[in-house]
Amino acid sequence: NLMESALSGRILKIFPIPNHENSKWVSYLELNEAGLKGMDSTYTKSILPLYFGTLNNAIKTQSYDTSDELLESINGYQKKFGAKVRPSEEKIDLEIAYNKYDVFQKLPYAYLFGAIMMLIFTIIQIFKDRKALRIVINGFHIFIGLLFALHTLGLIARWYISGHAPWSNAYESIIYIAWATMFFGLAFDRKSKLTVASSAFVTAMILAAAYMNWIDPEIANLQPVLNSYWLMIHVAVIVASYGPFALGMILGFVSLLLIFFTNDKNKEKMDLNIQELTYINEMALTIGLVMLTIGNFLGGQWANESWGRYWGWDPKETWALISIMVYAFVIHAR
């Protein structure tokens, strides 16, 4: 749908309707239905074809002065009739930079590189503890920490550009879950370096999933039901709970690998690392369960405000309850 809208030109809503009660903007294809009259109608219907015509000439002459003047004219029209909702120059510049650098598309590769290298050297250190290895591991630890800082700045930038918390759709939820996973991985880094490396690996996998072809990364307006302060509270808590759960998953997998490679010669060192990972795993699952439970109660409050009932046994509510029960059983059965 996004590609179709872009190719047809419908996504380019660049003309504000003067004095519209809802500050509506329309694309060139929608001008006939916009109800513009007089000079406004003449200007909006002629300026874009004229601009594209000058661009064609500019390609041949390599002089874009006329095109730039027409573009500035459109900019002036937007400022005059759409100032109420038009983003500030700072926000526009930031969005251009955000799309230009596309941080979230590059982060999976960087996280994956840091994770694999740190995992390799950390596993080698289990068998041969050398000062040089510790320096290399700490270097990759810092590298992953810098990636997390960049990840955080990307989320903050998207928040500022969109004007709402960046976990309102599938794409934003995925990059936020990835952030939460890496956050808790770094929070537990004092206990085990394997935790940081494992967290970076699963973070890379989660971020890569955000770029599946059915997921739309567009920054869009909130749906009416999501335009609530509960988006900041309920969704932030319940979606962030997936972070420690994802951390628990990857730590469990790494623990199984260590158990598989344990033998009589390395049993003592392996057991120590497995025990550390097990403690961290228990803490991660406990934190995740607490956040999921709190988030579920907050969701009930939001549902009551939006639909007049706390619980309706819809798929999301039902599976949230099932998840709470499953993780509660796992934690109490340890």
Name each model feature, range by range.
Residues 104-127, 137-164, 168-220, 230-262, ...:
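Hydrophobic cores of alpha-helical transmembrane segments in multi-pass integral membrane proteins
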Residues 262-274:
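Juxtamembrane inter-helical linkers in multi-pass membrane proteins
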Residues 65-72, 134-140, 278:
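Short, charged, amphipathic alpha-helical segments
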Residues 97, 227-231:
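Membrane-interface segments at the starts/ends of alpha-helical transmembrane spans
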Residues 85-116:
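Cytosolic-side membrane-insertion boundary helix
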